[in-house]
Every structure is written in structure tokens, then in C-alpha cells.
Amino acid sequence: TTGTQNVAVGANALDANTTGSENTAVGYQTLGANTTGDHCVAVGWQSLLRNTTGNSNVAVGSHSLDHNTTGGGNVGVGTHTLSGNTTGTGNTAVGQQPMLYNTTGNYNSAYGWTALQDNTEGNYNTALGGGALANNTTADNNTAVGYNSLTANTTGAYNVGVGVYSLDANTTGQQNTAVGYDSLGANTEGIYNTAMGTNALRSNTTANSNTAFGWSALNANTTGTSNTAVGR
């Protein structure tokens, strides 16, 4: 077979089709080791089950991008979403365990429950809710926005934070910022800091360049260095 438009629906779905083309597939082993990629989609149970060789990907439920090889546009959406995707590229991911152990990083995003869950090997990151940057390893450019925000991110890089527990005990520091609620929430291994509202530099440890602006501003900062502060 030499591919072209494809669809397929159940059982072993695109059972080792060669050579790819437009793809879709829907149930059980959906893109069942399709070779050689092209525009993909896949929808249910083992969705992109070890699709080879990548291209535009999507996948939607159950094991979603289940060990996809070799990368491509990625997206994901539900259950295990980017489940152990190998080897990275475009990424996104949306619900429950989004970037569950994605390997090997690249452009990232992620949105819900355990967001960037233990993503391995970092790259451009973002993440928005749930456990946000849930123990991301190994860092790169970070952001993170709600709930546990940078939840114990490892290992640092450019950080930001924004809401709820924001830089929540981030490890190991680097360029920091953080904006609301628990802000620099006992950040660990400091570096350039900033922080802005609610508990601002809340007992930041271990310091470095500081700043802080509102509400509890330099809230009992520990341990010193360059400081500033403006509001309460």
C-alpha cells in the first residue's frame, strides 16, 4: 500500500499502513504503528500507539500520544495525553495528566490537572492550571499561571509564576518573577527575584537580588541580599 487519504475506525485501525498520507483512525489501537506518518489525528483508546514516523499528530483520548515516535506537531487533549511521547517537537496537551513524562521536550504548553507533569527534557514550557509546572525536569524557559504554579519545578531556568502558590517552593531558582497570592512562596535557591502582590517575597529562601511591591512585600524575607520593597 502507498497511503493517500486513509481513515480506518476500529480494532487495529491503521495497522502498520505504509506510506502514511492524510490519516485519521478512531478506535482501539488506532494509528497502530503507522508508517510513515503524515497528517495523523487518532481519537480513542491507544490512539497514536507508537506512530512512526511522526508528522502533524493530534490524538484525543485514553493513552493519547502513547509513546509516539518520532515526534511531529503533537497536541494531545485527554487522559494520558502526551503519554511518554518520544521524541518531542511541537507539544501542547490539555487535560488530566497532560505532558505525562514527555520525552524529549521541545516547545511544550499543557493546561490542566498535573500540567507539565515531570516533563523531561524541558524546553520552552508554559502550563496554566492544576499542578502547573508539576516537578518539571529539566527546566528551560518556564512560565506557569495558576494553582500550584511552578510547583517545585526542577531545575530552575527563567521562571515567572503569576497566581495562587506561584513560585511554590521552586527549585532551583534562577531568574524568577511571580505576581500574585503566595508569590515567591518560599522560593528555594533564590537568584534575581521580583514578586508583586499578596504575600510578595513571602519568606523567600535563599534570597539574592529581591524587589517586591505590594501587600506583604518583603514579607520577612530570608536571607537578605539586595532588597527594595514599596507597599505594605
Name these PLM-found stretches:
Residues 1-232:
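Glycine- and small/polar-enriched repetitive beta-structure motifs of secreted/surface proteins
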